[in-house]
């Protein structure tokens, strides 16, 4: 382990999580925003559903760990909501089982510590035409529809309301933009840089508005090694140094 110890923010989910550290990804955005404040830890698993996640949740988040995460952001549902395959194989999970799985995951995370906070992300919509267009010749037919996405998204939101958890309703949020189909995805399913900006912005909004003590909003968290130093850059007048520990001018977008 490296020091100093920082709060941990864990991203736990399927491909939208695994790919979130790619160029312009929402995980990368959070890493930039929380630089020198918290460690963003990636636990993303391409193709996974809530059933597979439930099988390993106690290994990813052991209850006896010396340090527990301050925040866990969870996304499963996109693969669960795929239409069932005629073979009985594949990632589809019936709706009631999906809700039960997500509830068990939430309860496990709540048991980690009194200060572990949780945000669920619901299933975003898809560009159905583009999904069909990009069908891989190596895979049996992948059936994703917005009717199914909405059903699973609504169930996730309802579960979070029942458990008192924070949730980002991605299905509704994405569709606030008229051109969401063309700007939010790379292949009709996975997120473009613009789609990731929407996700990051919603997460940061939820964290800012949440009444958590201590606050996990990035502006409320101390910056590591932020003391003034004679080794800092020298000001234009040449008489003093300028502390750069809080600079954000290089961000592509100035986040609140």
From Swiss-Prot:
Belongs to the 'GDSL' lipolytic enzyme family. Its EC number is 3.1.1.-. InterPro entries: GDSL (IPR001087), Iah1-like (IPR045136), SGNH_hydro_sf (IPR036514). This is GDSL esterase/lipase CPRD49. It comes from Arabidopsis thaliana. Specifically expressed in anthers (stages 8-12). Its main location: secreted. Coiled coil: none annotated. Glycans are attached at residues 49, 79, 243. Gene3D superfamilies: SGNH hydrolase. It is found in: Secreted. One of its GO terms (cellular component) is extracellular region. GO terms for molecular function: hydrolase activity, acting on ester bonds.
């Amino acid at each position: 382990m490296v020091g100093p110890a920082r709060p941990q923010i864990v991203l736990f989910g399927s491909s939208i999580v695994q790919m979130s550290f790619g160029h312009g990804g929402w995980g990368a955005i959070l890493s930039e925003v929380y630089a020198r404040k918290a460690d963003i830890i990636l636990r993303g698993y391409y193709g996974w559903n809530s059933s597979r996640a439930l099988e390993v949740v106690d290994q990813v988040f052991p209850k006896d760990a010396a340090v527990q995460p301050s925040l866990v952001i969870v996304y499963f549902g996109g693969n669960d909501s795929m239409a069932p395959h005629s073979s009985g194989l594949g990632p589809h999970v019936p709706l009631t089982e999906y809700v039960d799985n997500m509830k068990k995951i939430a309860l496990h995370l709540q048991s980690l510590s009194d200060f572990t906070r949780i945000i669920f992300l619901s299933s975003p919509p898809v560009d159905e035409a583009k999904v069909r267009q990009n069908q891989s010749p190596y895979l049996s037919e992948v059936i994703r529809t917005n009717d199914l996405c909405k059903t699973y998204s609504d169930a996730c939101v309802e579960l979070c309301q029942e458990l008192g958890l924070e949730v980002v309703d991605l299905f509704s949020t994405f569709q606030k933009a008229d051109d969401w189909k063309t700007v939010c995805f790379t292949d009709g399913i996975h997120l473009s840089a613009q789609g990731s900006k929407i996700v990051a912005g919603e997460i940061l909004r939820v964290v800012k508005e949440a009444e958590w003590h201590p606050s996990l909003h990035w502006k409320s968290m101390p910056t590591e090694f932020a003391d003034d130093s004679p080794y800092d850059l020298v000001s234009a007048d040449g008489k003093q140094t300028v502390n750069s520990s809080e600079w954000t001018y290089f961000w592509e977008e100035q986040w609140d």
